Amino acid sequence: LIGLANVAGTLTAGYLGKRYSKKYLLSGIYLGRTVIATAFIALPITPISVIFFSIAMGSLWLATVPLTAGLVAHIYGLRYMGTLYGIVFFSHQLGSFLGVWLGGKMYDIYGDYTAVWWIGIGIGLFSAIVHLPIKERAISVHVA
């Protein structure tokens, strides 16, 4: 379910990214993830809620990829796209590692994942807000 929803969400985000502001779409995706995660931990866990969570979160998970790549290319151009997106991708992997590692440490300390979920929700809300001031215009390059 998550994988199928990922494909649909990524294709939809790419389509919408051609027509609407990428920063607002990214903000909306991060806010959507935050709302979905909050609902998931606030409501009773049932097979139906897990299926809904999987589909909803799956549709938003990789939807950031085409929008982020498009935003980097639009602002900085294609000349350094590989390097810049490599930095973005590396930082994402670093955050993934830290999230899993710290999540395990917090589980060892507290005996459950509640704090990890709430930190993730806070990071999602921060991500939604931090995209809003992005200026979606190309940076002009001045040759010395």
Spans of features found by a protein language model:
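Helix-to-loop junctions at the C-terminal end of transmembrane segments
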Residues: 10-22, 107-108
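A membrane-interface helix-boundary motif in multi-pass transporters
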Residues: 105-123
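Multi-pass alpha-helical transporter architecture, strongest
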Residues: 68, 121-144
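Hydrophobic core of transmembrane alpha-helices in multi-pass small-molecule transporters
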Residues: 49-63
